[in-house]
Amino acid sequence: MKMHRAVHIAAAASDDYAWCARLMASSDPWITLCRDLEECRSTLTRPGSELFVARDQESEKIPPLGFILLAPYGFAGSPYIASVAVAAEAQGLGIGSQFLDFAEQHFRSHAHLFLLVSSFNQRAQQFYRRHGYEFVGELNDYIVCGHSELIFHKRFHD
């Protein structure tokens, strides 16, 4: 059983973007969604998006252990988690959960937080449900034919 790893999450430095794009382009769901390296770079630098990386709290070593891409007004004017990725060697250490906690704190003044999960990504769907996100809709054939993007939502205030 892997142990929980404490990380430091901070805004990405300019040299982190290439690493994050390579991580995206070399892993699912982006492989199945036919996203190449250039499309991943473009996603990470989209105007209005904020990229944050996690580094080991003990050593702050390079490269990062993963990233989260946030869009403050990305879904119907509400905050949106655009992407979360954790390097294969760091998966199962609680880093994804720390990214969600970070995003929720970052957007705490808002009532809602949204994200999309690919229909084939069962592991991510379970992960988000465990963290209190609810399935609220489906976009059929949204990115690639044959797969849907599932809309998940978390409400912070009543």
Predicted feature descriptions by range:
Residues 128, 133:
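Conserved active-site tyrosine of GNAT-family acetyltransferases
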Residues 2, 141, 145-158:
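Terminal substrate-recognition subdomain of acyl/acetyltransferases
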Residues 100, 106-119:
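Conserved GNAT acetyl-CoA-binding A-motif
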Residues 1-15, 158:
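Conserved N-terminal entry element of GNAT/NAT acetyltransferase domains
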Residues 102, 126-127:
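Structural preference for long, well-ordered alpha-helical segments within the folded cores
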Residues 11-91, 97-102, 106:
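Acetyl-CoA-dependent GNAT
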Residues 115-125, 141-147:
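Conserved beta-strand-loop-alpha-helix junction that forms the acyl-donor binding cleft
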